[in-house]
Amino acid sequence: MNQVIAEPMSTKNILFLTNTLRKKFNLYDCTYFPIVEFIETVLPEIDPKFSYLYVDKAEMPDTYAYFDNETKVMVIREDVYEGALNGSGRDRFTLAHELGHYVLHSSGVQLCRSDGGRVVTYCDPEWQANTFASKLLMPDHLIYTLTPSEISKEFGASYQAAEIALYKAKKAKLAT
């Protein structure tokens, strides 16, 4: 089975990147990251090669969104876009995940295929993009003292994503 492998990246490094991004755009202490506005407005300004495209669900019935790192085009299903605009935690996470692929895997980072064996977690581009999405939408420094319900409401995340983010943030804090 072919598997895609990315350059190694730890949770700590990904958190550093998401916090740096938030600081650069004066969003460090913002609880509700404006993911749609960031993709539609900020990315095209900072990278003229980046573009996005909304497609009908019938065109991509089994895919919510994807980022093509060769063309730098993010393709998003219209229902996912509308869900993100309306605050759906799952859809906001999907867009943040694709932003993660853009940030982590489009600027000279080589993805390669492997012919077997298990890919270690920190080299898995999907794990990296999920971690990026979680840390971008629910940064550790803002969620430590909250409950999953509070995180879900204040940060626009699903309850399940909030539970996982809080568990990992507390675990990381204990490790330091």
Label each residue range with its predicted role.
Residues 1-176:
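Active-site hotspot residues in diverse enzymes, especially metal/ion-binding acidic/histidine motifs
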